[in-house]
Amino acid sequence: MSGNSANYDVGYPIYGAKFINEGTLLVAGGGGQFNSSFPNKITALKVNFQKKKHIRRFREITLDSIDDAPTSLDCNNNLILVGCNELFNDSSMENVNHHLRKFVFEQEHLKFVASIDFNRTTDPSVFTKFVYINQRATVAAIASSEVPTVIRIIDPRNLTENYEIETGREVNDLHFAPNGILLSYITSNSLEVASVRDGNFVARKTDFDKNLVLSNIRFLNDNTLLVAASLSNSDGVSLLKLGVSSKGVKILKTASFMFDLNGITSMDVSPNKKFVALSSNDNLVAIVSVEKLKLVQLVPRVHESTITKVTFSPDSRYLASTSMGNTINVLKLSGTSSSILRNIWKFFLNFVLLVVLAGAIQLGYKHNVHGFIYKHAHDIYKSKFKENTTIDQGSSSYFTINDDYRGITESADIISATDVASDIETEFSSFDTSTMRTTTEDEQKFVWISSSADSQFTSADIPTSASSSSSSSSSSFYEESVTNEPIVSSPTSEITKPLASPTEPNIVEKPSLPLNSESIDLLSSSSNSITEYPEPTPDLEEKLSSLIVEQSESEITTDRESVSKLLSTESPSLSHMPSSSSSSLSLSSSLTTSPTTALSTSTATAVTTTQTNPTNDAANTSFLDNSKPASTREIYKTKIITEVITKIEYRNIPASDSNAEAEQYVTTSSSMLLTPTDTMVSSPVSEIDPIASELERMVETPTHSISIASEFDSVASNLIPNEEILSTSASQDSISSHPSTFSDSSITSGFQSIEVSTVTSSVLASESIPSISDSTFSKFHSISEPVSSAIVETATSSFSKTETKTSRVIAFSTEDSERSSALIDNSEYTSVLADNLEPTSVLADNSEPTSVLADSSEPTSVFTDAVQSPKTSVGQSSLSESTNIEGTSMASMIFSSSGASIGALSDIGKGTLSVESASSTVAQPMPGVTTTAPSFVSSPHKISASSIDASGFVQKEIMIEVQSSKDSSEAFGVRHKISENVNTPVSRMLTTEMQASGTVDVTEDVSLSSEVISALNVEITSLPNPVAPPQTIAAPLNNNSNTNIVNDDNAVAGTVNYAGLHDEL
């Protein structure tokens, strides 16, 4: 313990000292009768180390000159007792000695109260040796210098004696317990503990070491005593910690200080019971720790003469010592330290140890001891862990994962998705996000692409769709890709990243399927040509139906060569139609476009989300922003994968200028039977790399394929806009107004038969016919579709073994109560249409069945001419002031061949059956066409066309599941391998999945362009009849109600945050 100290000379020898309070020290002394040169005084001093003068005289009382000097002093609670003999020359006072005097400290003044004689002797050699007051100042004990010592217990308040304790020996010191109940005193070799109430002895100890001379005693607490003793045969001091109990006194701890102290003249314990102060005969002050009985600080030569008293302040901050040399020393306690000698000794020991350690290290380095120690420890580690660790021989080492990295890239598949965010002007503002969620399951070694649930129906169950058209203007959504370099995934160790040209006005957003590179090559290319918007078909349900497509390894090489040739043959002349070079995605599947298989299956080789816009119209391109490049994302997958591609769009489109009100078209499929089945596309992956699978897990967020359907059901109702906007009519002269948009080119692309629940816009729309609502669905998955959505799911595939042919597509239409048949001028498709369309019948005028027949001998072109001629009346649109809406089912099917789309059968409600034509000569947008999808309600409604002026949302999700290879030939129909027998009809059992939901969609200025459809392609559009809830807040997939989509009239798109999904603007 270290601190500052201050000295003060009071001018007389000091025999007693005690702190009255934290800053006031009371001392007493004098020369006595034998040295009259020193006055006898009682002085109060102020101690404050914050002031310049740390100790100053505060109060003082001077005693009579004939009195003896004060020899003892104690105080508590401002009550002061001083032992001082008085001497009188008066003979009448010869037998009286008032040796005990009482003072009080009131209002910072010393006041004399009384004096009394308890010794009853006038011998001047007898003086008051000890005066002690308990902490509450209720009991005091005094003892004289007479031997044997008599201890008198008195009441300091009235100075009365209670009883006496005859010790029979000389008492060296005494002290009260903190509770004031016990009193302990010591002689040279014994200790006594007595009760203050009656004076009976409680405990006694007399068997101390004979070399110890007990000199001082203090209570640490009510049951613990600290005794200081000097050594009789040598220099030094011992401290003994004693415990007092009913069984006696027991030594708890002992410490000796041989070289530091020589005899003890005074002792005191700090009020906090942490330190004990000792003064020795050689004028040293030692501070010892009470807990460990170790020397904390030794202050040498504090006084020049013998130290008479040491005392602590009540707050334990100051330690004061007095001496016979008239001086007072006050030490401010601020820390812990030891004596100088002890510090020097510790430094010497540390230095020696440091030298020895340095020498040992140098010697060990010289003899390579550290090397032997390391080798020995390494051998122990290897022997211990290698014996207990068994490494699977079939798996790669945990510490050599980078060695197999090239193997990972060879076995992985590259999936590229391009997301573009562009600023668009005011009313043409749009908001589009794409999100993909994937789950993997490590069950099998083979990978298939399939949908979660499929449906099956025969070719006789041909669905129909309703169509309507009207004249309006619409905004175009334009995005751009970044290069025209294709993305080819081949079984090589290098990773080909897609590059894009920033100047190319083409946007293709492609979340494609992960397939093994040994079986299927993914081809994504973009050319200088402009891929144009198909007809806006707002998909309310998304359907993934496919059939197993297998191929041998020998056919893969040929397919790759054909893909390379196809990429190299980009021509600017094809810039106005969606050709194979501008397709979104191609899968070389080595399929033959035989006419016998054109309509027998619903087969798709890829799923691609394509959003493009015609840029020929300067009005549509004036507001486009081409300055922001696209970002490309590559994902490596080799395991069983389930993907959910979510698209959310926001459109703010003004109301239609048409005065006609909305009309509801209701259709039905009379004999469609849908049953669940497993649908798979592509060939299995021969091997799955385990490390690549681990890499895939880190890239994608896991989910479960079974839970996707339930998530769709739970949020579909919240994703439908509350405005129920019905269909409007379109001008029939729209096609003829753009005759330059028709060109001849083969369309060799695949469409993944995505379920579209909507009303297809067509210029061939005519008066609706009654329909029968008997179509059933096995399961409905509610997926909302945005207003004015123009998202078309397309996929392209290139075939090397079959030469694609271009054929004209004829549109079929039937007027009221009339039966019309359609013929195709291409003879090789005749048998297929006749085989598949013959059993199909549609009721016209509620009674007469209308059949669509195909005949190879008599091609009919009347409807083709009607499409190109603005004067030809295809049908009359049934428009009225208001139209009753009935919740019925509607479906449409679009047929296609390798060269072009064969057509689409549509049941357009009342009185008209039309087959929509996707002729190879049609590629230009039709101005003034408005497509509307009715909301699904169970009761009739009347909604005016003026209510169309509202914004809506579309959320579109495509779920793609990659499963293990299983034998599915027995499930839900017979499937044949196309690679083995492409001329044989694959199956008449169309495997598909129907997912249904409701939406409201209004689109203006929709372009009509040829849909990119492959040789084996059937597009089914169904319209179920669930009730749409009247709310616009779209709940996220995780049912988090706090995440909303805000739909306002200012065309501000709100961001949707899905838990576990990655949203991109």
Curated annotation (Swiss-Prot):
Q: Which GO terms describe its biological process?
A: endoplasmic reticulum to Golgi vesicle-mediated transport; protein transport; regulation of COPII vesicle coating
Q: Which family does it belong to?
A: Belongs to the WD repeat SEC12 family.
Give positions of region: Disordered: 458-477, 482-520, 551-625
Q: Which residues cross the membrane?
A: 347-365
The ranges of the WD repeats are 259-298, 302-341
Q: Motif range for Prevents secretion from ER?
A: 1062-1065
What name has this protein been given in UniProt? Putative guanine nucleotide-exchange factor SED4
Q: Which PANTHER family match?
A: PROLACTIN REGULATORY ELEMENT BINDING PROTEIN (PTHR23284), PROLACTIN REGULATORY ELEMENT-BINDING PROTEIN (PTHR23284:SF0)
Q: Where is the composition biased (Polar residues)?
A: 482-495
* Molecular functions per Gene Ontology: GTPase activator activity; guanyl-nucleotide exchange factor activity
Which cellular component, as a GO term, is one annotated location? Golgi membrane
> InterPro entries from the xrefs?
Sec12-like, WD40/YVTN_repeat-like_dom_sf, WD40_repeat_dom_sf, WD40_rpt
Q: Where do the segments described as 4 X 10 AA tandem repeats lie?
A: 824-863
Q: Which keywords accompany this UniProt record? A: Endoplasmic reticulum, ER-Golgi transport, Glycoprotein, Golgi apparatus, GTPase activation, Membrane, Phosphoprotein, Protein transport, Repeat, Signal-anchor, Transmembrane, Transmembrane helix, Transport, WD repeat
Q: Which residue intervals correspond to the sequence repeats?
A: 824-833, 834-843, 844-853, 854-863
Tell where it localizes: Endoplasmic reticulum membrane; Golgi apparatus membrane
How does the protein associate with the membrane? Single-pass type II membrane protein
Q: Where is the composition biased (Low complexity)?
A: 465-476, 568-621
**Residues the record lists as Phosphoserine modifications:** S65
Provide the function of this protein.
Putative guanine nucleotide-exchange factor (GEF) involved in the formation or budding of transport vesicles from the ER. Positive regulator of SAR1 probably through inhibition of the GTPase activation by SEC23.
Cytoplasmic domain ranges by topology? 1-346
Q: Which residues lie on this side of the membrane: Lumenal?
A: 366-1065
From the record, give the cysteines joined by S-S bonds: none
Q: Which residues are glycosylated?
A: N388, N620, N1039
